[in-house]
Amino acid sequence: DGLDVLAITEHVEYRRHEGKMLNFLKGYVPEGTEAINNNIIRRSADERGIQSDLNLPVKLARETARKYGLTIIPGAEITREPIAYGHYNALFTTDNNSLYATDALQSLRNAKAQGALVMHNHPGWRRKSLEHPEFEVKAYGEGLIDGIEIMNGAEFYPKAIARAHARKLFVSANTDIHDATAETYRLQGHSRNMTLIFARNNSLEALREALEARRTLAYSFGTIAGDEQLLKDLFTASVRTKVLHTDPSNGRRTVSLPNGSSVEYVLRFPGQNRV
């Protein structure tokens, strides 16, 4: 997909394939072993807690990423009931196994305690509005949120851009992919969602600095959204103006606008159709 960076953020509270994997490995595990607390989105885990190694997906991704020159951002998705609580990505985590707490707010605090940046995922998913429920009021009020997803899959939340501006959050666009990107995007003629991060390089340190400085834009289905000045800077860096001919009788010019980027721009005059 032409990516430089990939964030690995498996669900903490929802791990639907654990039971199937245990069945597949029944000769290697004690008879009667069952998945434990593998769906605790709407209820708390019991005293046994989470048995899985939540750091393993990051480890596996890093091993494969070396073959492709990809940088892996370690993370996890804190996944609670979507309307009252919502979903949150913890990025740059150091130990995903220490994130979970029965109190969702404490889970976010646990992420911040290990230096993670927390992104509010798909804030309009399954909701009728982007108004803050009580949990979000507390989470934002404590300064636990660093970024917000304004595009997720085929969904776009324009009002989240205003929130990002007001609360000084970085913006992002993500696939939230649970299948192959070729199936979901490429075979339908689309490029995958992605976040454009204006970093000095693709090291974890440079990426984190860019996110903290909010130098990001969101791309989805041919649309780029985010901070107006960053959008202007991207366009002027991509498109050049070249005068091809000047009519000496009236001064009219014929110009070309070569686009040096891989982004397709559509030009419109105010109130008119595309040029």
Q: What is the predicted role of each segment?
A:
Residues A116-V118, V171:
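Generic beta-sheet signal
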Residues G2, Y85-T93, R127-V275:
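Charged catalytic cores and adjacent phosphate/nucleic-acid-binding surfaces used
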Residues A76-R80, G124-R127, I177-H178:
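Short glycine-enriched loops at secondary-structure junctions
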Residues D1-Q114, N121, G143, I150-M151, ...:
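A metal-dependent hydrolase metal-coordination microenvironment
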